[in-house]
Amino acid sequence: MGNIIRVFGFAALIFFTTHLCVADSNQQDRYEAAPGLIDLRSTLSDGAHTIEELVQMARSRGFKILFINDHDRIAISYGVPPFRKILRYKKEFPSIMTNRPEKFLEEISRISEKYPDVIIIPGCETSAYYYWTGSWFKKDLTVHEYDRKILIMNFDNPDDYNLIPNLHNKLSFKYTKKLLPGVIIFIVPLIIGFIFLKWQWGFSPFMGMLLIIFSILAIINYNPFRSSLFNPYAGHQGIAPYQEVIDYVNQRGGLCFWNYLEQMSGIRKYGPINVNTPPYPQVLYQSRNYTGFAAIYGDNITATDPGKEWDRVLNEYCRGERARPAWGISTADFHEDGRAGEKLGYYPTTFLLKEFSRKGVLEAMEKGRMYCSRGDSRVWPRLDSFNVFGKDGRKAFMGETLTTSHFPIIKFKVSYNNEKQTPATLLLIRGGMLIHTFKGETPMEVEYVDRAAPPGEMTYYRLMDTRKHLTSNPIFVTYSETFEKCPLLPD
């Protein structure tokens, strides 16, 4: 009798869960695919076009979602000891901070009202940290990691920008409590200086004045009100300065993405200075709680190859070692239409939206319901559909999780938005392993049953083409044989 009750209870649970999932699937069928452009610069930093010109160009090419990511700051400085922050040379270029964040946000608000059919989301690109080695006199002065870039989305308040914890931002009280004890080492000689000054004996007034001046300069140089805990003369600091920025973005309700992980221009000469930013795909697994990274951009990328850094992060998420996965986007590094032969629209990210609104776009971005493409501003590869199904019709979209008692069924359709037949080779990746290669011409429609899916553990499926012009985000799946092998169910 007890076994019968357990069987009926288990069956009811299956029915109830299936009912909910099918209902949710019907809701998901109403997703709207909308291409957007990320990583755009305007004349408010180092771009050639105004924000309004960017909107007009994008609309004319079929894009109505724009992320404006001007530089928060473009600055670098080098100081000489003992007061490196006072005796320094600093070079700074136009940015959000030099133009004022208020002006940047007001301009986006004005253009958004003028073009209500376009969603414009403000943000920035930041260089969180850099450090120096070498010597100006030995002609080997080198700045490291300056080109490690983080894209920030959805910053709506001027203070969001004012308080970004990078090396050159405004004064902040965030770390004052932690830094204030360090001032004591300079307070002691300051007090001694006043004592010497009061004695008025021999060289004591002169020594007292020197101590006072030195101590005051040392306190200013130490600066317990600085925006970041780090300084550019302390050498390599690992992932910590970047994690500091990521944590800050999360606290402010923004989204953040690693950008240009393997750019080839990170090692170069800038006047008499060496710039040294080697490829840094390792930051994907070194850092935590970021939203994602640039999976397609105008340079080299290997982190998306099967079994590489992205898959390492996704597998850590599947094993419960990470709180969140990392999503891929396309980023443009767009400054001027036609520069280096590239135009606005070469790197679209297509979002699957519940509603065409700013809220809908940010929700899709945060949850990974999007895919990345590379094209020519008018034509690009399109992922018309990509789902994993259970046998009973339940399905999951990119960024979602499916639990099924049957072998997962992967279905996808790839085409080009000009509808022309184009040769394509698609890679289906499960858990970091290439499990099948599909060759043909677009439109290409595929159904594949994964009979080798690992039972009892979470994994994921993702797609990419061999040209790296199309990359999906993952769909997570747990395949469980429990239902089929339950000893209480009748044969």
Question: Which role fits each region the language model picked out?
Answer:
Residues G2-R6, A23-A33, S45, I51-V55, ...:
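C-terminal functional module detector
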Residues F8-H19:
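Bacterial N-terminal signal peptides
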Residues N26-N259, G266-I267, Q286-R288, A295-E316, ...:
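A metal-dependent hydrolase metal-coordination microenvironment
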Residues V80-R84, W136-F137, G271-V275, P279, ...:
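Short low-complexity, flexible loop/linker segments enriched in glycine and/or proline
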Residues D156-Y161, S287-D299, V361-M365, F407-F412, ...:
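Short, surface-exposed, charge-dense and proline/glycine-enriched linear segments
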Residues W258-Y280:
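Extracytoplasmic/periplasmic/luminal assembly and interaction segments
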Residues V275-N300, T350-G360:
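Structural recognition of alpha->loop->beta junctions
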